[in-house]
Amino acid sequence: LLDIISTGEFSVPTYNFTLGRPEGELRRYKLGPQDMVIVEGIHGLNPQFTRELPEGSCVKLYVSVKQQIKSANGEVISPMDLRLVRRIVRDIQFRDTSPERTLAMWPQVVKGEDRYIRPYRLTADYTVNSIHIYEPCVMRRVAIPLLRAIAEDSPYYKKARDLESRLMRFEPIDESLVPENSMLREFLGPVKK
């Protein structure tokens, strides 16, 4: 990060999520006078990566689903379950990872967050609640068929049924209605023409 600030230049690899490793040639970037770099990831708020940076050289954001969706009878879907649904939808499309594999990895994801993100979230300059109240209506159209494909003998069958039943409480909305510049596109992918 110090090199980026001092030289305005940096290189990044392309990460192949299917293979689980970087591949190909590094892409080189040179910043213009008005450009900025967004560093995203599990260690983005960790002070070990920012304590040596000049004061005022970075702005820290913590972006996460911060609220549940409730009905008159109580919680319909928790922030954690909504994040899991997002991940299932994203992983199948962009990481070639099955819903069952995503469910298997989820406890480790949460453990990593507890260790590497949550302790530092209060160091953020800004917190963004990334929930879209209509999100379950959109996600259900993609997620429910994926969840239904999980076999009854799977250790993740019960969780899949629970997520399905929660999503079924929402009216479906076609994902083509989600704007192209919406943060939900990170999970849904681009608008299909």
Please place each PLM-identified region on the residue numbering.
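Short loop/turn elements that form and flank the Walker-type P-loop nucleotide-binding site
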Residues: 31-33, 55-56
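Cytochrome P450 C-terminal beta-domain/meander region
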Residues: 26-29
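Conserved nucleotide-sensing/catalytic segment adjacent to the nucleotide-binding pocket
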Residues: 1-23, 36
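Short, flexible loop segments at the rims of nucleotide/cofactor-binding pockets, characterized by
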Residues: 14-21, 40, 103-108
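Conserved NTP phosphate-binding and transfer environment spanning the P-loop NTPase/kinase superfamily
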Residues: 47-193
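A generic hydrophobic-helix recognition signal that picks specific residues
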Residues: 33-34, 118
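Short beta->alpha connector loops
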Residues: 42-45
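Structural recognition of the conserved hydrophobic beta-strand(s) that form the central parallel beta-sheet
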Residues: 36-40, 61-62
